[in-house]
Structures are given as structure tokens and as C-alpha cells.
């Protein structure tokens, strides 16, 4: 890394945007949500969440990233993260190292690049999830985030399997929204659904059934308090976890017997936000009868891995 470069690592997912300054070793995490009123940006991350329950007719709540693709402008999010890192201070403009989905199209790369250039970034380098996570030894990688899951199997200096499926955290959240509506008649936001998922998962890890609370809208957009047991959320987690485990099993079954034996002994690596969630690791292990090695900071795996790509 050149001495005159100010490098920032970014992992901008559909749920969280993570920023890391290589020189100061400071890390910033924002929620990937923006509140707008017309063309005016009202808030980003937690500031945007404050608008979830007010002025619904005039304020737009945007979730700008899905499946690694830009749906709405991400420039306010980039500016906020870089500002919090003081990346614009001094004479040097920041350069960014950005993790992206392994199957991201060239058109989407161009959109990402233009967004960073519009934010005053000097240099942009992209690195795929597979490039970040791949190891020298044979590895069976399942990276399951908020909007997609990547499955990669690498051995003999080759990528033998590379598959992206659209079963991940957001699909769990959508099922939770549906379940809550069926049980209560109230609609809950994506943010509340994600919160219920996390709270229910924590309870399941502890083998408990707890009472979960949030707010929901009726048909007239009036807010009401909601209480449901965590067990009601389990079918949503189970459905998506089952799909992930079935695809992992399908990829496993394509391997030669020698590699199957290797992974039965050494295990499958599960990373991303869904590694934190109770369900995927249990069902994968049950389906293939092999150990599943979950990372310790699932939602921060990619930014943690990026820290080793460049040294300050």
C-alpha cells in the first residue's frame, strides 16, 4: 500500500454497511437504510429508523442494496461512513477496497464505481467474496448474508463449485412479516422483522421460548404494540435454513468420494449474518452429518477478512 494512500475497507450489505480505516484501525457500522422526503435526505442508518413510524405518506424509507445490487442511491450512506471515519480530513482523498458478490455483473460494478467517484473517492478496488474467503487448503465455504447465500467449494487449485442462491436473512424477515400479519392482523417493518429474528434466534440458542415485543400497523396505518412468542418465528427460520441446507447438500453430492470424506472430517465453514442465526448450521450438519464451523462474528466476517488484505 502506498504511503500516500488513505485506504478504507468497505463491506456494504443489504442490512449493514461496514467501514474500516486501515491507518487508524477504526471501524464504523451503519444500517443500510435511508430516509428521504422528495430529493432531501432526512437521515441514514439509525437516524433513518427514527422515521419508520412517522409521516408515512410523505417520507420514503429506502433499503438501497439487495443481492449486492444498487436499487437506490447509496451516496448518502457512503458519505456518512467516510465522514464518521474522518476520511475527508486532510489533503488526501480516500481510496476504497470494496467486497462485492462473486457473481456481480460488470454493469453493477460500474454503478458502484460511479457512486464512489461521486463521493470524492480517489481510487476504487473491488474484491469478490470468494477471493476474500478462499483458503490454500481444500475448503467448503457457505457465506450466507442478508439477501443471498454463496456456496463455494475449492480444491486442487480450482473452484469446483460456485453457486449463489437467494435464500438468506431477508427471506426469513419476509416470512416473519407474513407470520405476524397472519397471527395479529398487523404489518411490521423490515427492521422490526429483522429484530424479531435476532431475538428469537438468541432464545433458540439458549433453548428458551421467550416473549417478543414490537409495533405493527393496522390498515389505517395506526401503530399497535405486538407480543408474540419466539416459537412462532421458528417456521420462518426453519424454511429458509432448510433451503440453504438442501442446496449445500446438493453441492456436496456433486463431489468425488475422496473430497466428500475430506469435508466430512474437516467440516463446512459457515460465515455471514446467518452464521449467527440458530438454524442453518444445525440443519446443514443434520443433512450432511458433518461438522459446521461457524465464524465468531458472522455479520462482520467480510470486513474482518478485508483487514488482512492490505496493511497500513
Regions found by a protein language model. Name each.
Residues 1-42, 46-144, 154-268, 275-301, ...:
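Nucleotide/phosphate-binding catalytic cleft detector across ATP-hydrolyzing
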Amino acid at each position: 500500500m502506498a504511503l500516500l494512500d488513505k485506504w478504507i475497507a468497505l463491506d456494504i450489505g443489504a442490512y449493514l454497511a461496514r467501514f474500516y480505516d486501515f491507518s487508524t484501525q477504526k471501524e464504523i457500522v451503519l444500517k443500510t437504510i435511508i430516509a428521504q422526503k422528495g430529493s432531501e435526505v432526512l437521515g441514514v442508518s439509525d437516524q433513518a429508523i427514527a422515521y419508520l413510524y412517522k409521516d408515512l405518506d410523505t417520507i420514503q424509507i429506502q433499503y438501497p442494496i439487495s443481492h449486492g445490487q444498487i436499487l437506490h442511491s447509496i451516496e448518502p450512506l457512503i458519505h456518512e461512513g467516510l465522514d464518521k471515519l474522518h476520511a475527508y480530513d486532510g489533503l488526501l482523498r480516500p481510496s476504497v477496497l470494496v467486497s462485492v458478490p462473486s457473481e456481480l455483473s460488470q454493469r453493477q460494478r460500474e454503478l458502484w464505481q460511479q457512486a464512489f467517484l461521486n463521493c470524492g473517492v480517489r481510487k476504487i478496488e473491488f474484491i469478490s467474496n470468494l477471493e476474500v474467503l478462499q483458503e490454500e487448503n481444500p475448503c467448503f465455504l457457505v457465506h450466507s448474508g442478508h439477501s443471498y447465500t454463496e456456496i463455494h467449494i475449492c480444491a486442487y487449485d480450482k473452484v469446483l463449485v460456485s453457486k449463489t442462491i437467494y435464500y438468506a436473512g431477508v427471506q426469513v424477515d419476509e416470512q416473519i412479516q407474513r407470520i405476524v400479519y397472519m397471527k395479529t392482523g398487523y404489518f411490521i417493518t423490515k427492521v422490526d422483522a429483522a429484530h424479531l429474528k435476532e431475538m428469537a434466534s438468541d432464545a433458540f440458542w439458549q433453548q428458551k421460548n421467550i416473549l417478543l415485543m414490537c409495533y405493527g400497523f393496522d390498515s389505517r396505518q395506526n401503530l399497535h404494540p405486538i407480543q408474540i412468542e419466539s416459537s412462532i418465528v421458528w417456521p420462518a427460520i426453519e424454511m429458509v435454513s432448510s433451503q440453504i441446507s438442501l442446496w449445500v447438500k446438493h453441492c456436496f453430492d456433486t463431489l468425488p468420494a475422496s473430497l466428500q470424506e475430506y469435508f466430512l472430517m474437516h467440516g463446512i465453514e459457515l460465515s455471514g449474518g446467518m452464521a449467527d442465526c440458530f438454524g442453518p448450521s444445525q440443519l446443514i450438519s443434520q443433512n450432511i452429518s458433518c461438522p459446521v464451523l461457524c465464524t465468531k462474528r458472522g455479520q462482520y466476517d467480510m470486513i474482518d477478512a478485508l483487514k488482512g488484505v492490505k496493511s497500513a
